[in-house]
Amino acid sequence: MLSTLIKKMFGSRNERTLRRMEKSVMAINAFEPKMQALSNEELAGKTQEFKERFNNGESLDELLAEAFATVREVSLRTLGLRHFDVQLIGGMVLHEGNIAEMRTGEGKTLVATLPAYLNAISGRGVHIVTVNDYLAKRDSQWMKPIYEFLGLTVGVIYPDMSHKEKQEAYKADIVYGTNNEYGFDYLRDNMAFSLTDKVQRELNFAIVDEVDSILIDEARTPLIISGAAEDSSELYIKINSLIPQLKKQEEEGDEGDYTIDEKQKQAHLTDAGHLHIEELLTKAKLLDPGESLYHASNIMLMHHVNAALKAHAMFHRDIDYIVKDNQVVIVDEHTGRTMPGRRWSEGLHQAVEAKEGVSIQNENQTLASITFQNFFRMYNKLSGMTGTADTEAYEFQQIYNLEVVVIPTNRSMIRKDEADLVYLTQADKFQAIIEDVRECGVRRQPVLVGTVSIEASEFLSQLLKKENIKHQVLNAKFHEKEAQIIAEAGRPGAVTIATNMAGRGTDIVLGGSLAADLANLPADASEQEKEVVKKEWQKRHDEVIAAGGLRIIGSERHESRRIDNQLRGRAGRQGDPGSSRFYLSLEDNLMRIFASERVGSMMRRLGMQPGEPIEHSLVTRAIENAQRKLEGHHFDVRKQLLDYDNVANDQRQVIYTQRSSIMAMTDTQEVVEMMREEVMDSLVDTYIPPQSLEDQWDPQALSDVLSDEFKIKAPVPDWIDKDHSIQPEQIKEKILALAIEHYDEKVRKVGRPVISQFEKSIILQTLDNHWREHLAAMDQLRQGIHLRGYAQKDPKQEYKKEAFSLFTMMLDNLKYEVIRILSSVEIQTEEDAHVVEEQRRAEQIKKMNLMHENLSENDEASETQTFRRQEKKIGRNDPCPCGSGKKYKACHGSLV
């Protein structure tokens, strides 16, 4: 009541926003005579003037009126298009970081040039986001003359570009591309191995076209970069055959190749064991004669040996796992229950599979992932435009903090939206649609029939073929071809069947596309020939208007009112006539699930017969209520996805920030020293627990681990025997001093710059490996966390708690692994230090899958987009394909 009274007194929020912006429109219009008087050179010089004024302290808001007036004049001179006043308002809404709802045909592509130009003045870049590659290329080419006239550069990004081309494209002032491509490039940049490998600049300002499609419909599934794990089955099998030849050391001082630590569930090679396994590896031709297992090029081989040793020494059949249906299934050590689907990480599961002689599975691992919600919220400023956003205004505000401003049309809307017709059966409904299409054909009125699925569009196509009605079918598969067909859907008598997303972004012009007709003329066509084409188009245009404009037929109500409005919005552009009607049946999915009982009983009471429709406001209201319920359900699903992804997003930001800072470092000494101190402290605390009695200490095990894992000779038992009053802190200091001394020897051999390069490569490589394993662990946690609800626990809180625990564990393991590798690997030349970096770069060339599974029902035609690069497998002892002359394992295959 009170809110209604306030609206009557002051107007709605939308009306107040429009009134405020009308004052700015007057200011822009006041600049128009001045702009018209400028020469082309003077007009082009405005950009430099604006940049200087911005650098001298003027804000973009203060420059807005003059900048918009400049763009409008340039657009008129280059494209012959002058921005309407309502388009200026749309540009202001976008500049303020909100969503402009503009009807179909109101010129959203042209509107984007206003805020794009204004924000490009800052020099920090503008990203314009489209729904497909065709629109990115089309819009960039179409608007390019405006930007280039004003001295700005324009880039466009698409999947098949080379790395260098993409870097150049991102350097442009204004970049066009798809949401998927921007997201994948962000993820790839955070998998890069050096700053020079990155392509994106700062995420400054994004203008998202069809914002409802991108930020809502496609937001239910994340972007994922996954890579098939290297097929190392043969290597696991070969190393598995060597491990039984190693002998366990039963007691300290006895002969033996390895020791076991049951407390930590670890197995370590002794000095004799290192020599023995090197000898066995050489005989198996996995290691060159005289080559050390600890050479930089053999890090991954060492990893396989450790995994196989652990599988044989520490993991036992029917205790730690069982073998069932040719698979190794883990047994939970606490409950004794099997855990199908769970796998040990770091190659251990594959090593156990090799030991048991079952098939070795190579998993498709997630390398990086992000949701669109979290990706687009990283931009300093985000805005969007669409023809249908108001029904989702609450979600835009809640998730993205974006206000929806409904922009009035330039000309009054005269489209006639007819009431829904509801039939008892689908057969009756489709027969009625055929009759409507046939009647339109008699009048030569163009028809667009919208369907909710490819299956429905193909079924309808078959019915039209039986009736000998010519038509075109669009299924949202070939964007460029679609755009051409949809542009011609306004020709007299044209019949087009389209799934809801097909051809979105292209206007249906009554009479067909004049631009396409002119483009089909020969390059040297005379003005007279062009005039003939224009007259023919005008004749067709007038014929369609006389027939009633474009007819929209909906074959089924969608789950979202917004998608229905998008279909209706195809007609009635820029004041054109048009009409729309939805044909429904009680057998349609939405009606069957949500509204059939109520509407069905109503139809029975009215004595409806097969073939007779019902047309009533109560029916329309019942359907809209069903749609509201479903919209609320889908919002809850997306909100829940975001709640969970926010936990992962916090961790992602920490990892990516750390990764970028490490890449930027020239000297990593401080980072490594900090890691070393933490690792040594943690090791001592494990074997000599704080606040414990000396009887609880295990100094020999500590010495063994330091020797076997880190190559540090620390006689901890001797220190304790000589000084019974020695404290754990003193032991830590002694061990740390030995670790520093041991490492300083390596530094002296090759120099600090070389060692820093090697350290950086190892840190990044290890970080990527552990992050990948962590993502898999987070996926597993997410899949089962809802079961905590049965124990009266909040699954989200439990997920946060356990995710934090996993993250802490991952960071601890990361530090341990980095220090272990740096301490044990031998670096003799600068070339050794570059081996890891070269191999990591080669990883980028290997097979990588980019996925965005759009499970949203709103885009029924979309499928998983998977891009693959297939390459022949290279053997470890084959010549490296880079042409160095070395074996693959000693060059780019060193860590594979």
From Swiss-Prot:
GO terms for biological process: intracellular protein transmembrane transport; protein import; protein targeting; protein transport by the Sec complex. Keywords: ATP-binding, Cell inner membrane, Cell membrane, Cytoplasm, Membrane, Metal-binding, Nucleotide-binding, Protein transport, Translocase, Translocation, Transport, Zinc. This is Protein translocase subunit SecA. GO terms for cellular component: cell envelope Sec protein transport complex; cytosol; plasma membrane. It is a peripheral membrane protein. The keyword Cell membrane applies. May bind 1 zinc ion per subunit. One of its GO terms (molecular function) is protein-exporting ATPase activity. It catalyses: ATP + H2O + cellular proteinSide 1 = ADP + phosphate + cellular proteinSide 2. Its EC number is 7.4.2.8. Residues 855-879 are annotated as: Disordered. Belongs to the SecA family. PROSITE patterns: SECA, SECA_MOTOR_DEAD. ATP binds at Q87, G105, E106, G107, K108, T109, D507.
